[in-house]
């Protein structure tokens, strides 16, 4: 399991988050069948504040059931930030929401 790097900046940037997700991708792919992972929301818009959570969009190869809870916890442990996890399949039937997320998501 990838460990949180010791040199994590106190203030994450989108680039540092994407880099951390890229490093974690092989593990996430093997463990959770993650096809694609990206960041959207306040961090992408550089509007995050103290206590902001990190909005992460994940596309899976197949449903993982309750393992989604473990995925969220792993992402929080890897990044050291609270994560709001959104599954792409879960918002696909909400076209406006999907469009808004697609407009700003930055993939790892």
Locate predicted features.
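Conserved histidines in hydrophobic membrane contexts and catalytic metal-binding motifs
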Residues: 39
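Short beta-strand->loop micro-motif that forms the acidic, two-metal-ion catalytic signature
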Residues: 55-58
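Catalytic core of pol beta-like nucleotidyltransferases
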Residues: 1-36, 44-50, 60-108
């Amino acid at each position: 399991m990838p460990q949180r790097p010791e040199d994590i900046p106190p203030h994450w940037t989108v680039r540092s988050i994407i880099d951390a997700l890229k490093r974690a991708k092989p593990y996430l792919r093997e463990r959770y069948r993650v096809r694609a992972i990206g960041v959207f929301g306040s961090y992408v818009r550089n509007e995050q504040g103290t206590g902001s959570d990190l909005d992460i969009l994940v596309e899976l190869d197949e449903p993982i059931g309750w393992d989604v809870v473990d995925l969220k916890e792993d992402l929080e442990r890897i990044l050291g930030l609270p994560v709001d996890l959104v599954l792409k399949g879960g918002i696909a039937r909400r076209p406006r929401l999907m469009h808004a997320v697609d407009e700003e998501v930055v993939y790892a």
